[in-house]
Amino acid sequence: MINDINNFIESKKLSLNSRKSYHYDLKQFYKIIGGHVNSEKLALYQQSLSEFKLTARKRKLSAVNQFLFFLYNRGTLKEFYRLQETEKITLAQTKSQIMDLSNFYQDTDYPSGRLIALLILSLGLTPAEIANLKKADFDTTFNILSIEKSQMKRILKLPEDLLPFLLESLEEDGDLVFEHNGKPYSRQWFFNQLTDFLNEKNEQQLTAQLLREQFILKQKENGKTMTELSRLLGLKTPITLERYYR
């Protein structure tokens, strides 16, 4: 299985730090299961994760699930296994607390899904707005995005941590940020890309709406008033934001 771990890591385009992280987590997985994958061994491994914090468990589960899928795809495993996080964040918690989603900025097999998630999380955009984003809407000199909607224009500052993922997409051919043969993708495509990315990160409970809510919570924490936040979101009235300011 050690060779399988090395082959799996080599098959992914990872930074040096990510390679080390994957190797450490999968070597730990190998030691616990003894190189044999079955339901009992996986249950034992999952039980061993109880001592780690939620974010660390999610990272380890994500690495192991990707590895298990790799083994299944190659025919090494005859049965498909997938581990689930047992301690889920409840919907109520998600709506009231800012989540640690730093793993969204790490390597992924779903770069389009990651960019969609980060555009929602960092700028509060809706999937419909993302689908219509033109590369000309971005000014990379001043790091701003201009959006016109319903005769309302808003200027959004692009966060530094978003830029590396965004610039990569802006350098590709085409007028739209996301397009296929010159046409925007369907709503289902955006949904599927985001879902695949969230599943990879073991954040299956999240949706585009809840990611946008994370943007709202962060902006409120940063001192934005209800009126200022409504302008950032392109809302005609701040009424729908009242529940976050009670």
Curated annotation (Swiss-Prot):
Family (UniProt): Belongs to the 'phage' integrase family. XerD-like subfamily.
Core-binding (CB) domain boundaries: 1-72
HAMAP family the UniProt entry points to: Recomb_XerD_like
A GO BP entry: DNA transposition
Gene Ontology MF terms: DNA binding; tyrosine-based site-specific recombinase activity
Active site positions, chain numbering: K149, R212, Y244 (o-(3'-phospho-dna)-tyrosine intermediate)
Every Tyr recombinase domain range: 84-246
Domain of life: Bacteria
Coiled coil location: none
Protein's job: Putative tyrosine recombinase. Not involved in the cutting and rejoining of the recombining DNA molecules on dif(SL) site.
GO cellular component, one term: cytoplasm
A Pfam family that the UniProt record links to this protein: Phage_integrase
Keywords: Cytoplasm, DNA integration, DNA recombination, DNA-binding
Organism: Streptococcus agalactiae serotype V (strain ATCC BAA-611 / 2603 V/R)
Record protein name field: Tyrosine recombinase XerD-like
Main location per the UniProt record: cytoplasm
Subcellular location: Cytoplasm
InterPro entries membership: CB (IPR044068), DNA_brk_join_enz (IPR011010), Integrase-like_cat_sf (IPR013762), Integrase_catalytic (IPR002104), Integrase_recombinase_N (IPR010998), Tyrosine_recombinase_XerD-like (IPR020876)
